[in-house]
Amino acid sequence: MTEPIVVVGAALLDADHLLAARRSAPPELAGRWELPGGKVEPGETSEAALARELREELGVEAEVGERIPGEWPLKPPYVLQVWTARLLPGSPQPKPLQDHDDLRWLTPAELWDVPWLDQDVEAVREIAGRL
């Protein structure tokens, strides 16, 4: 049995707003929205991976907070784990740098106004209960 490979996602929060990122690649995911993040590299902690991915994908410096309970299956052998995160003081505002073409800060009332990737829906439900 193959060990799961962890993909980390960020519930990047600003007050009661959640950052959503619209995929531009690959073509089968383009136009759908997700929590920003990426794969944990060998020897890297999940928290360090998430901070690195936010720097690479959005150009921000963020503090990783608590893990959202749950683990969501992606395409095998990947699983999604989500952490809260907040921008550090002095961090630039997020920009869509890699694999994204738009970003939106969503209020609790707007969370379901975007078409989320299927694998992110349950995580967003968990996050919604915390906003």
What kind of feature is each model-predicted range?
Residues 111-112, 124:
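A generic structural signal for short hydrophobic patches within well-formed alpha-helices
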